C-alpha cells in the first residue's frame, strides 16, 4: 500500500469524510484490520480564506505547496488536496512536489464519463462555479459541459458554504434552497450535478437530489484508494 498525503482543513468539516472514506475503502478492499497508510496536514482555513477574499492566490499557493512538500518529505507517495476551490493553485503544488498529485476534477471527470454523461450542473464556491480552473479542465480533458446557477443564486450558494457549511451549520432551509437550484439546472438540461464543494454532500443527501449526484469528496477519496493500492 502506498502512503497518501492529505492536505486538509479547508474546511476541517469536509476533511473528516476524506479520512473516513479512504479508511473504509482500504478496509473493504483488503479486509481484516487493514486501514489506510496516510499523513494529514490540516491548515488554518482562516489564513487561506483571507487569501481567497483578497485575491492573493499566489500566497495561498505558496502555503499549500509548502505544506504538500512537507507531506512528501514525511513519506507521502501521492498528494490529495481535500478541497475543490483550492485546486485553483494546483499547479503550485505540482511544481513543488515530485510525487503524483491526484486532481479532484480529473477524478470527477472520469466518474461522469463512466456514467455516460456530458452535460452536468455544477454547484460550489463562486470561485469554482465562475472561474476556469475547474470548468475549463472538465471541458478540455473530458469534453464535459457544465451548467452553473444564475448570478444571484451563485452568490447565495457561496454565502451558505462559508457562513454555514464551513462552520458546521446544516439547516433544512438551506438544503431546500440547494434542491430548488438543482431542479432549475435539471430543467436546463443538466444530466447530473457535481457537488463541487466538499461540504455540500454534508448538507444535501444524494437520495434527495432530483439529478444523479457526483459527490466530489466520495469520488476523490475513492480515487485515492485506487492510487494507494495500485
What are these regions (language model features)?
Residues 1-230:
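Non-catalytic structural scaffold of enzyme domains
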Amino acid at each position: 500500500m502506498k502512503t497518501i498525503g492529505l492536505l486538509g482543513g479547508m474546511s476541517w468539516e469536509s476533511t473528516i469524510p476524506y479520512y473516513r472514506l479512504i479508511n473504509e475503502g482500504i478496509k473493504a478492499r483488503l479486509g481484516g484490520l487493514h486501514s489506510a497508510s496516510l499523513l494529514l496536514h490540516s491548515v488554518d482555513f482562516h489564513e487561506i480564506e483571507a487569501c481567497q477574499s483578497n485575491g492573493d492566490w499566489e500566497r495561498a499557493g505558496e502555503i499549500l505547496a509548502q505544506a504538500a512538500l512537507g507531506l512528501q518529505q514525511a513519506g507521502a507517495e501521492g498528494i490529495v488536496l481535500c478541497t475543490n476551490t483550492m485546486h485553483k493553485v494546483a499547479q503550485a503544488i505540482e511544481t513543488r512536489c515530485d510525487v503524483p498529485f491526484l486532481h479532484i476534477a480529473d477524478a470527477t471527470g472520469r466518474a461522469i464519463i463512466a456514467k455516460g454523461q456530458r452535460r452536468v450542473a455544477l454547484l460550489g464556491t463562486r470561485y469554482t462555479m465562475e472561474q476556469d480552473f475547474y470548468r475549463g479542465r472538465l471541458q478540455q480533458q473530458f469534453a464535459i459541459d457544465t451548467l452553473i446557477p444564475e448570478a444571484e443564486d451563485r452568490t447565495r450558494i457561496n454565502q451558505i458554504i462559508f457562513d454555514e457549511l464551513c462552520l458546521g451549520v446544516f439547516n433544512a432551509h438551506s438544503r431546500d434552497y440547494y434542491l430548488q437550484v438543482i431542479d432549475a439546472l435539471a430543467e436546463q438540461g443538466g444530466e447530473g450535478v457535481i457537488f463541487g464543494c466538499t461540504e455540500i454532500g454534508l448538507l444535501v443527501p444524494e437520495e434527495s437530489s432530483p439529478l444523479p449526484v457526483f459527490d466530489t469528496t466520495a469520488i476523490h477519496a475513492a480515487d485515492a484508494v485506487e492510487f494507494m493500492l495500485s
